[in-house]
């Protein structure tokens, strides 16, 4: 809509990834230090929704009126990148840093796989809801995007409010906590890495997987619409997403029964295929 270039999109993806990583480290350590999860999750979801709503105001007519002496298109692109980082900060604070930690706090070896399986299934369901639910919108119209931003904002704000009433604050011991900054750098110490070689090998493998997804997903829809000239690409994506969601949930249950060692090898083999 702002005639953004491929370089602009790459810059936004890179900045968002850095924001998510740094935020998860800083807020995750702060949550551990304070022994609080719920306030970060609820507050983060609410602010996440409000930051999404701000995109409805980043329009060339609005920006051009407020700043007539600069290129409205260029300023809109810059503001989108900045607000994407702000949105990512709130989202990563709530979800990546604190919700995932809360989920780990509330489960054990007998139930963690089932819970994580359902949790991992949700992004797939969300993709289906977004692309399926918004298919009827004319995305070339600004009003359609404004409506979409309002809907998503409302969902997050309501979810954040519900968090205050629906989840319990886990009992986290903070007496023996190290200093805040020691908690942040703990996982990067060479001695810790040497003590947990398998863990860090798997983290490295997952990082490679994450890089591939970040490269693949932004251009998947463009491939469908521009290269294949498909208008009903959701009908292609939907069956794959549904099957992947079901398999993810079932494999989480299998993980609880098989254990980590016997369940991770088939998972990696499937990814390699």
Task: Label each region the model flagged.
Residues 1-8, 216-234:
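Short amphipathic helix-loop junctions that connect adjacent transmembrane helices
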Residues 51, 58, 64-94, 207, ...:
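Hydrophobic core of transmembrane alpha-helices in multi-pass small-molecule transporters
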Residues 19-21, 113-138:
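Glycine-rich segments within core transmembrane alpha-helices of 12-TM secondary carriers
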Residues 39-54, 262-273:
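Structural signature of the two symmetry-related core transmembrane helices
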Residues 60-62, 163-177:
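Helix-loop junctions on the cytosolic side of multi-pass membrane transporters
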Residues 171-203:
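Juxtamembrane intracellular "pre-TM" segments in multi-pass secondary transporters
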Residues 22-36, 247-260:
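Helix-to-loop junctions at the C-terminal end of transmembrane segments
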Residues 1, 195-216:
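Pair of pore-lining "gating" transmembrane helices in MFS-fold secondary transporters
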């Amino acid at each position: 809509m702002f005639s953004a270039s491929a370089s602009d999109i790459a810059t936004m993806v890179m900045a968002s990834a850095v924001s998510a990583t740094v935020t998860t480290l800083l807020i995750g350590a702060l949550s551990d230090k304070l022994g609080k999860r719920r306030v970060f999750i609820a507050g983060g979801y609410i602010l996440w929704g409000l930051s999404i709503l701000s995109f409805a105001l980043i329009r060339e007519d609005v920006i051009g009126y407020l700043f007539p002496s600069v290129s409205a298109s260029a300023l809109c692109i810059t503001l989108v990148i900045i607000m994407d980082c702000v949105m990512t900060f709130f989202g990563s604070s709530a979800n990546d840093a604190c919700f995932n930690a809360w989920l780990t706090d509330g489960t054990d070896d007998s139930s963690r796989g089932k819970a994580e399986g359902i949790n991992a299934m949700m992004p797939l369901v969300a993709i289906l809801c977004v692309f399926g639910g918004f298919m009827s919108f004319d995305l070339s119209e600004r009003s359609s995007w404004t409506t979409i931003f309002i809907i998503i904002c409302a969902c997050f704000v309501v979810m954040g409010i519900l968090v205050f009433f629906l989840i319990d604050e886990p009992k986290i011991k903070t007496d023996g906590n190290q200093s805040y900054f020691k908690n942040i750098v703990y996982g990067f110490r060479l001695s810790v890495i040497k003590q947990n070689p398998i863990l860090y090998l798997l983290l490295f493998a997952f990082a490679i997987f994450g890089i591939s997804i970040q490269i693949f997903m932004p251009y998947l829809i463009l491939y469908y619409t521009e290269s294949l000239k498909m208008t009903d690409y959701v009908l292609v994506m939907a069956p794959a997403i549904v099957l992947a969601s079901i398999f993810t949930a079932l494999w989480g249950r299998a993980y609880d029964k098989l254990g980590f060692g016997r369940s991770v090898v088939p998972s990696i083999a499937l990814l390699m295929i």
